[in-house]
Amino acid sequence: MNRRIRRLGIGLVALFGLLFAQVSYIQVFAAGRIAGDPANARRQIIAEYKVERGQIITADGTVIALSEPTSGNATLKYVRRYPEGPLFAGVTGYYSQVYGRTEVEQAMNSYLSGDAPELAVSTLADLVLGRPKKGGHVITTIDARLQRVASDALGTSPGAVVAIDPRNGDILAMVSDPTFDPNELSSQDTDAIRAAWERLNADPRTPLLSRANDELFPPGSTFKMITASAALENGYGSSSPWPNPHELDLPLTTETIQNFGGETCPGGATTTLLTAFVHSCNVIFGEVGLEVGAQALADQAHAFGFCPIDPPDETGCLQPTIQFPIPFATGRFPVSGYFEGNDPLVAISAIGQDNDLANPLQMALVASAIANDGEMMNPRLVTQIRDPRGRVIKEFPPRVYGQPISASTAAVMRTMMVDVVSSGTGTAAQIPGLVVAGKTGTAQHGGPGTAPHAWFVCFAPAGPDDIPTIAVAVIVLDGGSLGSEATGGQVAAPIAKQVIDAYLTG
């Protein structure tokens, strides 16, 4: 009898062990796969509201997303809160029981919800000890103080600011205007959520889209950083002479390229690449584009991470480009075959118009590569995942994207960009005691009478012995308050100056 009881006991223990193992597997190891089933998406989001979701935290320790317990709601035990919602909306995204997740909330969902394999030990311990399941915390690269400075500097002007550490690709700040409050989409009231969603989607300013990384714009003269790099990489120098006419006649057409204000570039009958860059002379850079050719321009743009496209299809990249955890509309530049037999488009593309498209994140990466001796890092937004008790369980190290230009070309480009700020179109970015390198841009778009976008891209400190620690790109749409009279030097450069000044001296 005792033997039978012992066998029965062993059998029951084994069965309970198998049952426990299966439950543990489902709750710990298979949760992510089950959550990924589209049929379970809505059900899974509601189920996640029973878990205390992890926090999203800036590099300097500011909590920008957290979960708080609700009262009297058996289904939604927690609600998501964003203490400075509009300021960080482009980073956090939203977490909504109706409309799902976006940005970091989506990209890092398995960690935030506690379902990632790296959190298996923590989740299993909670299960064994009868503690409620908790999500992990996501540590971002964002500098909360600099984010506030960038937002204040941009003000209510529609546009965006991106700041990057060139050494590792860390996104220090990423702001966009107009923005939205993710708290409106993350409440317990589904009717209020839907009303906010309809209002936001009906807004012609599209506040749910980030100008920093979601949209694309003509880069204008900031693209001359790429055209100049192509020239330097192909044997030309900063002092190479170029014919200096009043305007450039485009081959096979009656059209011309003119400099800003119809002026002639300084230098006399001939001028140099350096002078043309410092004064942003369209005529000379049209010549440079024609001289180096479509292949060299396309190769250089694509090396900087611009997506190769074959117009009129401008939607799909023809090869993988920059990796980023949240949605990123990488820059666009046509394949060389697009320009075959069409030299005018080569000249126009060399000055950042036609099918050239970019956003502040893309252009900040270009500046970062120049600042970093020609080596471009992948943009990094998340550095660590921590378990609910604060222990680091996963790290995301910096990753090199590529070497779009040589160190020698980067050194020449740095000197040229320093001259833009010291004596050219970017003097509004000067900071006492600091050497700043930059490039202005005034990008035409739309039809006649449409105000241009104002650009400024820069990095600092940029002295001969300095190691640059910040690169900034600013766009102000439609010239901001100056409208059709705006230039990048007038409108965007002062914004970038405030960001760099705050980061390096404030």
Q: Language-model segments: which ranges?
A:
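Beta-lactam-recognizing serine transpeptidase/beta-lactamase-like catalytic domain environment
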Residues: 167, 171-221, 226-478, 488
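Periplasmic/cell-envelope proteins involved in peptidoglycan metabolism and beta-lactam response
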Residues: 1-194, 204-221, 239-240, 295-303, ...
